[in-house]
């Protein structure tokens, strides 16, 4: 397993958020001014990880064989509590970094679904798919 890093952008929802939770329509796009960057490193400990990254690691290891121990660390300049999807960007960047290190290629849909699983089932965040679809596809989205 090699060391790796990956990024994900925040997003803006122009129309429909949070109606996507209930199957409603939405319109949004990623913001390229900021990003969450996650580093996977085999030389650091896992004990210092924030709960968001611990939950992400757990979801990844449920579906993929983890070859050796590694730690995750992050840098993010996404404004906190601004409604830009910062937590999903951090989860998505971590999943991308783990996939890259383990030779796994995500489809945009599986990446978005795994991110939503981390947030809903492991962290109790109430969310719909729109944020994650925008961030996984990295483009303007009407859904």
What positions do the PLM features span?
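ATP-binding N-lobe of GHMP and related small-molecule kinases
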Residues: 1-88, 96-108, 138-140
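Alpha/beta catalytic cores of group-transfer enzymes, especially the acyltransferase/condensing modules
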Residues: 106-143
């Amino acid at each position: 397993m090699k060391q790796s890093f990956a990024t994900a952008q925040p997003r803006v929802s122009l129309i429909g958020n949070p109606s996507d939770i209930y199957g409603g329509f939405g319109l949004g796009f990623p913001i390229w001014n900021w990003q969450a960057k996650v580093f996977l490193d085999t030389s650091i400990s896992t004990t210092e990880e924030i709960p968001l990254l611990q939950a992400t690691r757990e979801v990844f290891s449920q579906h993929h064989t983890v070859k050796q121990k590694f730690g995750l660390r992050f840098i993010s300049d996404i404004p906190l509590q601004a409604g830009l999807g910062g937590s999903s960007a951090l989860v998505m960047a971590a999943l991308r970094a783990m996939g890259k290190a383990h030779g796994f290629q995500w489809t945009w849909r599986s990446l978005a679904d795994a991110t939503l699983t981390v947030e809903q089932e492991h962290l109790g965040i109430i969310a719909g798919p729109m944020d994650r679809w925008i961030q996984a596809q990295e483009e303007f989205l009407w859904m």
